[in-house]
């Protein structure tokens, strides 16, 4: 009996009502709508190749982007964390990161198998992670060129003695 797949003792069997409802409907999960379609926002999925997603992030950073945002949900949260940590590790201290968590509401369509019923919708929550990767080496400090009036005021301010009246 060691290798058998019997349910554990004490588990409650599912009700027949729940089973019937699920057997008569097909669940179609709708993808979440991206909030922002910007080049610096990268949506991490489990279907895309890991190396391709990492390469895309590296290309954005190497092209001069000050910051990029990685968005991931559910199963792809660990993948997003791995990409962020690899980017920071490979940058030799040039990159830093900040992480925020959130909950995203998703909508599923329940399509009936028979034509007598209507399509129904079901809302559910999913955990999401938003990772901001900052490029520390690209913070440009712009030094403005002084205008003529500023240079004259500075030259007068450098004279420390008493002003003499000229005749």
From Swiss-Prot:
Which is a GO BP term held by this UniProt record? rRNA processing
Please name one Pfam family that this protein belongs to.
Answer: Rpp20
Under Gene Ontology molecular function, one entry of this record is: ribonuclease P RNA binding
UniProt key word Ion transport: no
User: Record's SUPFAM superfamilies?
Assistant: AlbA-like (SSF82704)
Main localization is: nucleus
> Highest taxon of the source?
Eukaryota
* Compartment(s) where it occurs, according to its Swiss-Prot or TrEMBL record: Nucleus, Nucleolus; Cytoplasm; Cytoplasmic granule
Region feature (Disordered): 1-36
Please give the InterPro entries that the UniProt record associates with this protein: Alba-like_dom_sf, Pop7/Rpp20
One cellular component (GO) term of this entry? cytoplasm
For this UniProt record, give its keywords in alphabetical order, as a comma-separated list. Cytoplasm, Nucleus, tRNA processing
| Subunit details | Interacts with Smn.
Quote the function comment for this protein: Component of ribonuclease P, a protein complex that generates mature tRNA molecules by cleaving their 5'-ends. Also a component of RNase MRP complex, which cleaves pre-rRNA sequences.
What is the protein name stated in its UniProt record? Ribonuclease P protein subunit p20
Native organism taxonomy: Eukaryota, Metazoa, Ecdysozoa, Arthropoda, Hexapoda
